[in-house]
């Protein structure tokens, strides 16, 4: 949980004043990692210049570079790393030509990122979460006991700040490294499929399953410990509020809760994204297999034609008679020339003629309301008209009558915004909702 007290302009001015810069080609980076590995084997953490030259010689062998003038090139590399504040040089008057070198925090941080952070395993994560759980439990008990400001700072704030927060940062950094490993696995799978996908299927399956299993184990470990960690953080938060509340503790607990939520959610998100990638790879492989069937057939056919005189062959062709489609494209869904008898009421007229007659009759009947300026109760009029017609015509009659009525005028009640009452217009459940038309 890093906190930066400097502002951006202050940091920019500081970097410019000290002329900070880092340039690490792959050879220099390998040299730095070699120094870190050899340095970890020493109890004092110090290395002489001759030992650094030997390490540089091993790096040159690894890159198949010439061993001529190794001492000069090693001296240039050492001086460059001292200038970039990756190494500290210590000299004395008694041994001017035998300086001692130690890695700086920057050099240790870079080498640690490329070496130790790669060792991201379920066991390491479990140990980190176990330490965090123990620290949080002790801090929660100390918070519930209460005490003065010194007690809160020593037994609650300090463990959260310098132990729990740093382990959370380490887990977060490890998860970011895991993201890079997933990207590296994707690149390996793409390279395998581009070379020879048939031989690469087994390797791709192994890479996919190993990564999926690792992500699943890590997520199970996080979920198992996440609830307990959150519970202890809530205990500390409640005890802090009951005791009057320390702003530093409250802010730190909130930051830790956010960090823990982000750590746990990372696992599930990584699993979901990897499942999607897994499906994409398998779909690609299936498509490649389907395409390769045709490619193999065409290749074998081409070879057979080329070597026909050496290995004659016969080709048997099966040509079945073509099936003709006898459907009529102009055939309508419903034949107009239907058989059967029409009802007597419809025997002499078409449907459109009925609608025209109804429209004329209703229009003439409704004109009386406009001429006499009488209010038109649409519900009552509809009920009277529908009673004069069979049920089969109720819908058409109602539609025509409403269409003619709204052409005559409007209802003042429509502008009030109040809904009209539902009125029954026949004995079969049909209803209408309309205000009385009173303005023509």
UniProtKB/Swiss-Prot annotation:
It comes from the Bacteria. HAMAP family: MukF. GO terms for molecular function: calcium ion binding. InterPro entries: Chromosome_partition_MukF, MukF_C, MukF_C_sf, MukF_M, MukF_M_sp, MukF_WHTH, WH-like_DNA-bd_sf, WH_DNA-bd_sf. GO terms for biological process: cell division; chromosome condensation; chromosome segregation; DNA replication. This is Chromosome partition protein MukF. The gene is mukF. Its main location: cytoplasm. It is found in: Cytoplasm, Nucleoid. Keywords: Calcium, Cell cycle, Cell division, Chromosome partition, Cytoplasm, DNA condensation. Involved in chromosome condensation, segregation and cell cycle progression. May participate in facilitating chromosome segregation by condensation DNA from both sides of a centrally located replisome during cell division. Not required for mini-F plasmid partitioning. Probably acts via its interaction with MukB and MukE. Overexpression results in anucleate cells. It has a calcium binding activity. It comes from Photorhabdus laumondii subsp. laumondii (strain DSM 15139 / CIP 105565 / TT01). Residues 208-236 are annotated as: Leucine-zipper. Coiled coil: none annotated. Gene3D superfamilies: Chromosome partition protein MukF, middle domain, MukF, C-terminal domain, Winged helix-like DNA-binding domain superfamily/Winged helix DNA-binding domain.
């Amino acid at each position: 949980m890093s906190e930066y007290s400097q502002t951006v302009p202050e940091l920019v001015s500081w970097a410019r004043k000290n002329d900070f810069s880092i340039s690490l080609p792959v050879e220099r980076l390998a040299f730095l990692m070699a120094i870190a590995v050899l340095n970890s084997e020493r109890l004092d953490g110090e290395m002489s210049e001759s030992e650094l030259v030997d390490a540089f010689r091993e790096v040159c062998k690894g890159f198949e570079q010439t061993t001529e003038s190794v001492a000069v090139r090693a001296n240039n590399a050492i001086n460059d790393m001292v200038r970039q504040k990756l190494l500290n040089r210590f000299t004395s008057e008694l041994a001017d030509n035998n300086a001692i070198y130690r890695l700086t925090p920057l050099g240790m941080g870079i080498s640690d990122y490329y070496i130790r952070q790669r060792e991201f395993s379920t066991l390491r994560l479990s140990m980190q979460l176990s330490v965090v759980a123990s620290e949080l439990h002790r801090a929660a008990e100390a918070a519930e006991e209460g005490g003065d400001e010194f007690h809160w700072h020593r037994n609650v704030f300090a463990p959260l700040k310098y132990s729990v927060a740093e382990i959370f940062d380490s887990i977060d950094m490890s998860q970011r490294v895991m993201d890079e490993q997933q990207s590296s696995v994707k690149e390996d799978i793409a390279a395998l499929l581009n070379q020879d996908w048939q031989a690469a299927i087994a390797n791709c399956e192994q890479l996919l399953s190993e990564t999926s299993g690792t992500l699943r184990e890590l997520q199970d470990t996080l979920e198992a410990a996440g609830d307990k960690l959150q519970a202890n953080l809530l205990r500390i938060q409640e005890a802090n509020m009951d005791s009057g509340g320390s702003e530093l503790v409250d802010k730190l607990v909130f930051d830790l809760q956010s960090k823990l939520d982000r750590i746990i959610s990372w696992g599930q998100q990584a699993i979901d994204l990897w499942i999607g990638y897994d499906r994409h790879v398998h779909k690609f492989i299936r498509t490649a297999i389907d395409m390769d069937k045709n490619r193999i057939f065409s290749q074998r056919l081409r070879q057979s034609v080329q070597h026909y005189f050496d290995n004659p062959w016969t080709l048997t062709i099966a040509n079945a008679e073509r099936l003709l489609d006898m459907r009529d494209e102009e055939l309508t869904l419903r034949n107009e020339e239907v058989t059967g008898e029409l009802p007597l009421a419809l025997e002499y007229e078409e449907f459109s003629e009925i609608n025209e007659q109804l429209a004329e009759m209703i229009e003439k009947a409704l004109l009386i309301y406009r001429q006499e300026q009488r209010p038109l109760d649409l519900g009552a009029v509809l009920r009277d008209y529908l009673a004069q017609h069979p049920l089969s015509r109720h819908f058409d009659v109602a539609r025509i009558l409403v269409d003619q009525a709204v052409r005559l005028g409007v209802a003042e009640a429509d502008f009030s915004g109040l809904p009209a009452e539902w009125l029954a217009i026949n004995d079969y459940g049909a209803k209408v909702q309309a205000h009385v038309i009173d303005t023509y």
